[in-house]
Amino acid sequence: MSATQPILNSIQTHLLSQIDRFAIELFPDNPSEYFLRDESGAILIQYAGSKFERINSTDIIQQRRTVTIALTVIARSQHNDDGALAILDQVRLAIVGFRPENCLACALINEEFAGEADGLWQYQLLVQTETWQVEQTKAVDLPKLANVYSRKPTDPLNPILQPKS
């Protein structure tokens, strides 16, 4: 079961509900063969890595996981209403504070110009969120609690119970 894919999917679903002029897709498996179909541009969502905090537990491993997501904006223009700069503004507003599945709210890390080629302007926005990575353990078959007898300190012992000899 993937913990990362649901994060990407929930970001995609959220951006689709907030931005209507651009295609919003997961980063392609083969970027060299990617074809921009949308007349305005696209926002590509990519897992960019994770960092884990130090282990402090002595029994089960549980670590805070800081997940980095790259949002690549590809636009056919830079300055008009459908341009890269306008869409970057919309993406920032949509993503800051959004909580992907099983995560804390998203925060911005960095944004930079990635280049221009054949009239396509590219910017990359790095976003981070946090979740937990927890060790998977097998259930241990321990004896089950059968009966509980309650009493106050002043009550006599239950006759079913025998004191240790």
Indicate where each model-derived feature is located.
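Small/polar-rich, solvent-exposed N-terminal microdomains that initiate assembly or binding
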Residues: 1-58, 81-82, 146-165
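Acidic-leaning, charged glycine-interspersed low-complexity segments
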Residues: 39-44, 84-140
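Glycine-rich loops and low-complexity Gly/Arg-rich segments
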Residues: 49, 67-72, 94-98, 132-134, ...
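Residue-level signal for secondary-structure boundary sites
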Residues: 53, 77-79, 133-137
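Short, solvent-exposed beta-strand/turn "edge" segments of beta-rich domains on protein surfaces
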Residues: 55-64, 116-118
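Extracellular/virion structural assembly segments
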Residues: 60-66, 74-93
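Oligomerization/assembly interface segments of phage tail-like spikes and tubes
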Residues: 63-77, 121-133
